């Protein structure tokens, strides 16, 4: 492990799948194969480490990038619906594809629980990002169709599907 971003990337699955309260620095050392000194060099404590994980790995994926917004704003309505992923789907796919999390749908719920417990303003930051997302979707879709898209229904159905996926009925 060479740098700060490597430590964050190795710790993110721990946050997504575990209880931050129960994870000790010694556990982090073992899991990411780094010494306490290397971790402390970049992060003064667990709270700082957690905040950096959320700020640098969770929120950037939860929010649509400017490039994604640009592409979606130019898409046809059917392409928009085929390409658009809710913030929850973006997090789920990122956890699965980039971090190898086995049950990323379950991990989403855990991230929200951990974030609301250990990150000041987590809930309000998520709310602000969701409002930006809804405003963006309303501008894109609202200008192209006559009927009103019930954004709350879209998100409720999406969260319901992710919840069912998280149940791991295998």
Range-by-range predicted roles:
Residues 6, 10-17, 64-71, 108-111, ...:
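Solvent-exposed, amphipathic alpha-helical segments
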Residues 46, 53, 57, 61, ...:
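Hydrophobic/aromatic residues within well-ordered alpha-helical segments
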Residues 86-90, 134-170:
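C-terminal peripheral helix-coil segments that are non-catalytic and often amphipathic
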């Amino acid at each position: 492990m060479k740098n700060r971003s490597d430590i964050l990337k190795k710790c993110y699955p721990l946050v997504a799948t575990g209880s931050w309260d129960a994870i000790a620095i010694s556990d982090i050392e073992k899991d990411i194969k780094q010494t306490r000194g290397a971790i402390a060099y970049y992060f003064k404590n667990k709270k700082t480490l957690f905040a950096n994980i959320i700020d640098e790995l969770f929120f950037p994926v939860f929010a649509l990038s400017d490039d994604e917004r640009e592409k979606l704003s130019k898409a046809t309505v059917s392409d928009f619906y085929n390409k658009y992923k809710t913030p929850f789907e973006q997090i789920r796919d990122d956890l699965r594809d980039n971090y190898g999390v086995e049950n990323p749908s379950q991990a989403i719920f855990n991230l929200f629980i951990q974030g609301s417990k250990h990150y000041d303003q987590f809930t309000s930051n998520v709310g602000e990002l969701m409002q930006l997302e809804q405003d963006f979707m309303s501008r894109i879709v609202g200008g192209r169709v006559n009927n009103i898209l019930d954004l709350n229904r879209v998100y409720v159905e999406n969260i319901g599907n992710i919840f069912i996926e998280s149940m791991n009925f295998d």
